[in-house]
Amino acid sequence: NWRKILGQIASVGAGLLGSLLAGYE
């Protein structure tokens, strides 16, 4: 199911982006 895969990629990407933003603060 490609939608499930895209959802997982999106959640991982959001987590990485959040950790990067948290690191800048």
Curated annotation (Swiss-Prot):
Main location as per UniProt: secreted
Source organism: Pogonoperca punctata (Clown grouper)
Family (UniProt): Belongs to the grammistin family. Group 3 subfamily.
Superkingdom classification of source: Eukaryota
Protein localization: Secreted
Single GO MF annotation: toxin activity
Expression sites by tissue: Expressed by the skin glands.
Cited function: Thanks to its abundant amphiphilic alpha-helices, it may integrate into membrane phospholipids, leading to lysis of the membrane. Has hemolytic activity. Has antibacterial activity with a broad spectrum against various species of bacteria including both Gram-positive and Gram-negative groups. Also has ichthyotoxic activity.
Keyword terms: Antibiotic, Antimicrobial, Cytolysis, Hemolysis, Secreted, Toxin
Gene Ontology BP, a term: killing of cells of another organism
Descriptive protein name: Grammistin Pp 3
Keyword ATP-binding annotated: no
Gene Ontology annotations for the cellular component aspect, listed alphabetically: extracellular region
Subunit structure, as described in the record: Exists as aggregates of 3-4 molecules.
